[in-house]
Amino acid sequence: MDGLVGRKLGMTRIINEEGIMIAVTMIEILPHYVTQVKNKEKDGYCAVQVTTGNTRDKCLNKPKLGHLKKLGINYGKGLWEFRLNDSNRLISVGDIFTLKVLKCINKVDVTGISKGKGFAGAVKRWNFRTQDASHGNSLSHRAPGSIGQNQTPGKVFKGKKMAGHLGYEKATIQNLAVINIDIKNNLLLVKGAIPGVIGENVIVKRSVKIGYFKEMSSI
């Protein structure tokens, strides 16, 4: 398993050995308890289901509560799944995964729910250019312009970039450098910013593009 669930604690800065100041994000990753192992014969795919953190039983619905109580595992904040290869047959229910899973990884991808910014215009939401400041333009400086064609096709195509709700959607930041792993305090420090507000749950996985970049650099 090369992915873990963490909680965004916020940002800070550290000074490396060369004296360069680096902005980092602190992610708290508590121990993960395996609650179910799925296989291809029974479930159609291979995956491991985990829970982490602590919560009160009244915060869980009946199916999750019964599932965890049956296994005798502490009530976590939720259930998450991570895909496995067919070769990962040694994982069983009750196993514990910690930050040591990421110890030999230099780059990670972090997935979370981005900050919600409410209703936004096309300039802010899609980086449209503004219209002329003068030359006859009046009250349309930040308007998007035409959204269609003529009688043919006579409609607005789906996916047209227009004003609307900005943020609060799934976002992934790729190839973030791992600055430090503090196993004692369950902290992971990554370079740069990650999606979400402070306290948001995020998924930390091994970077999927780092191998590709290494291949390209050797050509």
Curated annotation (Swiss-Prot):
One of its GO terms (molecular function) is rRNA binding. Methylated by PrmB. Keywords: Methylation, Ribonucleoprotein, Ribosomal protein, RNA-binding, rRNA-binding. PROSITE patterns: RIBOSOMAL_L3. GO terms for biological process: translation. The modification N5-methylglutamine is found at Q151. The keyword tRNA processing does not apply. Transmembrane segments: none annotated. It comes from the Bacteria. InterPro entries: Ribosomal_uL3, Ribosomal_uL3_bac/org-type, Ribosomal_uL3_CS, Transl_B-barrel_sf. GO terms for cellular component: cytosolic large ribosomal subunit. Part of the 50S ribosomal subunit. Forms a cluster with proteins L14 and L19. PANTHER family: 50S RIBOSOMAL PROTEIN L3 (PTHR11229), LARGE RIBOSOMAL SUBUNIT PROTEIN UL3C (PTHR11229:SF16). Belongs to the universal ribosomal protein uL3 family. One of the primary rRNA binding proteins, it binds directly near the 3'-end of the 23S rRNA, where it nucleates assembly of the 50S subunit. This is Large ribosomal subunit protein uL3.
